[in-house]
């Protein structure tokens, strides 16, 4: 009788915990857990090994514990360093002039508890460098002979240039709003309704009806890029897990040449177009930004920067092409 009572109490406790937990991950349209908690494979938020261990979906570092003294992101990347890295983002020739603010970046970063809080100080700085490098490539206004070099011109562009289409794919879950277009905007140049929808749901903002918030609100703009950065989509790991060393490649990954490093992040973002066919100028541009930012931080880049010999992960529902 006592044994049956204990089992019943345990079951009820689990039900109470599950009933009170917030849905997250693929079960909730890519939603992230509050406070940097882990999202378990079942779509529940928490910080236990069951949440943060095998098959954890996002923010798998859990609620960050207090880091080394001075590890707050404003100490890792003060305003002066941010301005040095994105040296020409406010140049008069840049369409995104005065939009990508330091305060917007910091506000967005602090809303993702595991970003730049995982690992030692060098690992945290390396994550910032990798994030800013990949997004600098997506928004670059640089050219080979640009003043201060091509890798000083990240975050120049805000909206996709030319005459972009609607990027509307019929979807019952993420229906396109009348008259709205889902072309590239912001640091990651997020595209398509099936990306704006889950990003907005995760952030608590209606981006299907208001996609231009990504180009008018700096914090939301950075948050969409960080949402992409922190969110895995099988078989792709999250960029966060790769750069912080939390991702262990499977046998299939290894046979495809996908080893931990900056190159896998390029594969996650745009591998179908840029990886697996030897040298690619776009890949080299990403690496160029990354090396410069790591140099400014005074840290190493790690190994496996290129993806020329990696097979693509294949098409996913997150941002497939930029």
From Swiss-Prot:
InterPro entries reported for this sequence: Chitin-bd_1, Endochitinase-like_sf, Glyco_hydro_19, Glyco_hydro_19_cat, Lysozyme-like_dom_sf
- Spell out the reaction equation it catalyses: Random endo-hydrolysis of N-acetyl-beta-D-glucosaminide (1->4)-beta-linkages in chitin and chitodextrins
Q: Which residues form the signal peptide?
A: 1-21
Q: What class of enzyme is it?
A: hydrolase
Task: Enumerate the UniProt keywords alphabetically.
Answer: Allergen, Carbohydrate metabolism, Chitin degradation, Chitin-binding, Disulfide bond, Glycosidase, Hydrolase, Plant defense, Polysaccharide degradation, Signal
The residues covered by the Chitin-binding type-1 domain are: 22-62
Coiled coil regions, renumbered to chain? none
Pfam families (UniProt xref) = Chitin_bind_1 (PF00187), Glyco_hydro_19 (PF00182)
Role summary: Defense against chitin-containing fungal pathogens.
Q: What's the protein called, per UniProt?
A: Endochitinase
Q: Which organism was this protein described from?
A: Actinidia chinensis var. chinensis
